Curated annotation (Swiss-Prot):
The keyword Cytoplasm does not apply. Coiled coil: none annotated. It is found in: Cell inner membrane. It comes from Serratia proteamaculans (strain 568). This is Putative membrane protein insertion efficiency factor. Keywords: Cell inner membrane, Cell membrane, Membrane. GO terms for cellular component: plasma membrane. Could be involved in insertion of integral membrane proteins into the membrane. Belongs to the UPF0161 family. It is a peripheral membrane protein. NCBIfam families: membrane protein insertion efficiency factor YidD.
Length: 85
């Protein structure tokens, strides 16, 4: 069962979606990565929560510049919580 999103994660995802609907269409396609940085941010926030998801999204956005070749850069998998004790 998936854990529910924290209120902070929901707010940040809402802000990213607002960016996707309002600002991104005005700028046109600029992201050099797949998935796009905004989709990456939503997935990272959903998978890892507000703190780690924000950190991953920030690192991704900072990599998205003309000197980086881009390409496929998925959100890392969440470590398995079923460790042997």
């Amino acid at each position: 069962m998936a854990s529910p999103l924290s209120p902070g994660s929901r707010i940040l995802i809402g802000l990213v979606r607002a960016y996707q609907l309002v600002i991104s269409p005005l700028l046109g396609p600029r992201c050099r990565f797949q998935p796009t940085c905004s989709h990456y941010a939503i997935e990272a926030l959903s998978r890892f929560g507000m703190i780690k998801g924000s950190w991953l999204a920030l690192k991704r956005v900072l990599k998205c510049h003309p000197l980086n070749p881009g390409g496929d850069d998925p959100v890392p998998p969440k470590p398995d919580d079923n460790r042997e004790h």
